[in-house]
């Protein structure tokens, strides 16, 4: 059996979302529990929005909460030629085809689907057509030839057995008409080349998983295990988005939430072990498993985060608390001067009993 290998694959287009942090945490904990490796892949193929400073901030944010990846970062944009090569291999195998539908044709198909109140699925016009009939002046996309008959089943390590009718999966694009690969192709090729054994991600990726499994099968590659974790919702029960307040890791560190407290909270957000609430880092690694992840969305509750943070402030060793406070002030307030250090340290035993955040202190 292969050594367990997991990954977290953010796009460097902005600050790290709290949902992404939990996904990274679950991947990291699972790999450590299984004595495996955890890898970071930077999905930076969106050249307009991807920024080096965002990549640096993502790595810093993960490190802040205690997550460090093994080896070098895997940079997706450096592997584009590999993705294109696989698209062409699929074409040669007969597992993909060139589609010459114009933008206008596709829009008309989508319009008809909307009128009938049906989900849009490409009509597979060019699936079995002769390329000799290809119109001039149109650059084709390459589409994967998805299964049409029967059902596909997935043994999801969190959700259980999941089944889908194959005719609901369209012949999805793997190479755009400008020659650039799409997400489902790139992610599959990268995961294969990186030797990933377990793909742990949000359950909004379930349909992508069925598409990606077909690419694995068409290429004759080993298919990894998949686990889809429920998304995080707001306290009102709506899907948490980047537009919500306190949706990024920076939002929490800025108000004085301690990394250990936030990590403990995110661990318990959708995962449980007996009736235990507080976990040290070592305990988290020892007890974490995929069986403990629930199937329903979890609600992000700020009052519980503050309560967890208050517990850590009150119980942490005062030397460690001072170091956290010193680092917090250096980044968000003003650096603590040496002549104030003794006074602050002597006051911590009193101040920590009145505080829920480092900002309160």
Regions from the PLM with identified roles:
Residues 57-65, 91-95, 115-126, 244-248, ...:
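Short, structured secondary-structure boundary patches
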Residues 90, 144, 305:
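Conserved S/T- and glycine-rich ATP-binding loop of Class I adenylate-forming
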